[in-house]
Amino acid sequence: MLPNFENARVLVVGDIMLDRYWFGEVSRISPEAPVPVVHVSRTEERPGGAANVARNAAAQGAPVSLLSVAGKDEAGDSLARLLHNENVNVVLHRDAGLNTTIKLRVIGRQQQLLRIDFETSPSHEVLLSKLADFEKMLADADVVILSDYGKGGLT
């Protein structure tokens, strides 16, 4: 059984990513190369990495804040929207030189066929501003979760 999170103020700090899924059917092999051709019929976006940790804590009833770095891009906007919809207070330091990490998975007939990663590391200046926010937010947290996926947001 999980502990009761309803009264614990949770702060999640770490690497966020957008998990994208393209689902479809494979009916043939490409004539250009020996690879399956996927006819995409459905797509999904889900919070990944530290964003998924924050979403899971919020689902347990905890008031959750997430502190992270994202690019000034569509993927960063999507993550902020998805987390807002899950009642996560999102504090994102947006870096114009950073591509928000995306993990794109292509699924055919219930089998993952391919994963494509889009990622870059955040700037030193953005990390310093995040550190300043962390010091401010720490006093209001009962639980702190550091979620490091090696993308440069923590290490």
Go through the PLM ranges and name each one.
Residues 29-32:
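Flexible glycine/proline-rich, aromatic-decorated loop/lid segments
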Residues 1-27, 39-155:
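Ribokinase/PfkB-type carbohydrate-kinase core domain
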